[in-house]
């Protein structure tokens, strides 16, 4: 039995014939949709009834910025303690006098407050002198000092003055170091004009109170809270956040970057200890460097930025690079 002749075209085509490039689809059929994940060729339009294909998985519009004043877990901090030390030393060498003079002035002020308080307490206290003579005939005296109510009041006021001065110094040094991190020109006076001083005072009181309460709970909770709240004052100075929000932001920042926070804290402690070993004169260098490390760490871990360290210019007579024709 003979087979019927085949029609030209694709045997699988139920309509037969050649569906060339210029032909139209038969009635009842629309243009085939584009393959998944691809759009129409450039310069063409999609047929009616079809919308633009969705973007491939993993793509889409960029996410919006995080709320101001708070870090985000999805943001890479890019923090390195080596970079923090290098950047801080570079910035210190470029602003040495501007950084050292305020630290020296604050140290003199602290010594004056401590000395005045101690002197007044001793002067207002009752002293009793007792003389002793041993069996060998050698005489000696002992002085017993009993604090009076007036001396107690002076000591209390001295502690308040010392606490306020320490917070003022902390805020002033942070203000200057934050301006350095922003690339702004700074002077000695910059470190004596702290920003958001009221927020800083309340934030400091909150930290001291919560640390004291934690210290009553077997000491360790107080130490832990003091560590995780280390950036609270920086948030108050830099972003004008409320005391509670500053503490929350610091806890979140440290909690999401424990390793970097610990390494930075150790680097700051080392800078101060080395300064103490150099007969305390080295603290005029150690304290500013530690403050710069603190600011660098705060900015990087909280999603902020710092102006990169300026490299020294090449020496005079440096050969030029290759010239293009």
UniProtKB/Swiss-Prot annotation:
Segments passing through the bilayer: 96-116, 153-173, 205-225, 273-293
Membrane topology recorded in Swiss-Prot or TrEMBL: Multi-pass membrane protein
Principal place of residence: membrane
Subcellular location: Cell membrane
GO cellular component: plasma membrane
Positions of region (Disordered): 1-75
Protein name: Uncharacterized protein MT2637
Organism: Mycobacterium tuberculosis (strain CDC 1551 / Oshkosh)
């Amino acid at each position: 039995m003979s087979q019927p002749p085949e029609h030209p075209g694709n045997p699988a085509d139920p309509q037969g014939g050649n569906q060339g490039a210029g032909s139209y689809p038969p009635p009842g059929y629309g243009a085939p949709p584009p393959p998944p994940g691809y759009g129409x060729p450039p310069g063409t339009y999609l047929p009616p009834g079809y919308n633009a294909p969705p973007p491939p998985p993993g793509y889409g519009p960029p996410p919006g910025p995080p709320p101001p004043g708070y870090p985000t877990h999805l943001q890479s901090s890019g923090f390195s303690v080596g970079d923090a030390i290098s950047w801080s030393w570079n910035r210190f060498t470029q602003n040495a006098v501007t950084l050292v003079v305020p630290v020296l002035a604050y140290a003199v002020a602290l010594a004056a407050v401590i000395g005045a308080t101690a002197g007044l307490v001793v002067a207002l206290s009752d002293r009793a002198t007792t003389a002793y003579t041993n069996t060998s005939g050698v005489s000696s005296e002992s002085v017993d000092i009993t604090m009076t109510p007036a001396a107690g009041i002076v000591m209390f006021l001295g502690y308040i003055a010392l606490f306020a001065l320490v917070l003022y110094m902390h805020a002033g040094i942070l203000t200057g170091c934050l301006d350095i991190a922003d690339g702004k020109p700074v002077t000695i006076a910059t470190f004596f004009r702290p920003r958001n001083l009221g927020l800083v005072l309340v934030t400091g009181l909150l930290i001291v109170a919560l640390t004291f309460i934690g210290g009553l709970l077997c000491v360790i909770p107080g130490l832990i809270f003091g560590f995780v709240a280390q950036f609270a004052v920086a948030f108050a100075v830099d972003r004008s956040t409320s005391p509670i929000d500053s503490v929350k932001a610091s806890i979140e920042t440290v909690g999401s970057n424990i390793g970097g926070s610990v390494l930075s804290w150790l680097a700051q402690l080392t800078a101060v200890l080395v300064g103490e070993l150099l007969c305390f004169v080295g603290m005029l260098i150690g304290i500013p460097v530690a403050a710069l490390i603190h600011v660098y760490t705060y900015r990087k871990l909280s999603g902020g930025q710092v102006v990169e360290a300026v490299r020294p210019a090449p020496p005079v007579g440096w050969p030029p690079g290759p010239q293009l024709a």
